[in-house]
Amino acid sequence: NQWMFRVGHTADHPLRIHPRLLHPDPMTGLFPVIAESTAVRMDLTHSGWSDIFFLGMDYPAGAQVLNISIDLCLNKNGETSEPRPPVEAYVRVIDQPLLRLCSVDLETTTDVRSIGEVFDFAKDYLGLLKAAVIASGIVPPGIESARQPLEDLLARLAGPGRGLEVVSKVNNIPKGSRLAVSTNLLGSLIAACMRATGQVNSLEGALTETERRIVASRAILGEWIGGSGGGWQDSGGVWPGIKLIEGVEATEDDPEHGISKGRLLPRHHIFNTDEIPPGSRKKLEESLVLVPGGMAQDVGPILEMVTEK
């Protein structure tokens, strides 16, 4: 991710929109859409805040979480819908030289026309989408103080007179669910933006392990840039299934060596069907009911307090 902090001018931006996304449909005039859907995560053991990345780096042996990726179905009046990924992200080129950000569930849209607006998280309710645009490298962190117009940056990415539309959608999950919805939505948005700019090998399908780790690291970056903070286990929905996420001691080959005891990113061990048989998975699935408490909470102050302690 180091290159994102070194780009200080729009002319130095290395990313380009994937060629397949630059040709509009001749009938509708609309450009192709990148669609990404992601699970949310359930933390069965509670990490005890050990997954805050710099705490895990100080004491990697104590950073362990049993984490499950889940799709959700709603139960209304005795009728249950089919399970589906609870968060979705979409990216496409538009024929206007601006950055259009839209949250379907919040019913909010804004047109961003300057680089400074991208970094203004207090201006509207779309800070998560702004964080994704920054952390994915579309508007890299190093360009925050650049004086060039956003239009120039978008022209370099997608061509003159063009811009990007980034859309998020959360499917019927109440606030305060404790399922790390915002972090996994951030990861989904980052993955979609990375696909659109050729930073992922394919425009659709599963991410590779290396790609997942990049998405997770950028989700951490996006959370802290946006001011909400967070830990690495919250992006567990990017990985499938039931997994053990644990801190790893830094070795001589790691950039963290000599700086901290542990690595920035943890190790993800996805349990196979020999370790957790299908019957056990089925029993676990059938024994869980999620009931929302209806209490939304800003965990930023709590994270700050835990970190200070």
What role is predicted for each listed range?
Residues N1-A155, P174, T197-G205, E209-G229, ...:
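C-terminal nucleotide
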Residues D124-L128, R162, V181, L185-L189, ...:
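Generic hydrophobic, aliphatic-rich segments that mediate packing or membrane embedding
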Residues L154-S168:
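Acidic-glycine-rich active-site phosphate/pyrophosphate-binding loop
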Residues S168-R178:
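Cysteine-centered functional microenvironments
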Residues S177-N201:
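DPxDG-like acidic metal-binding loop motif
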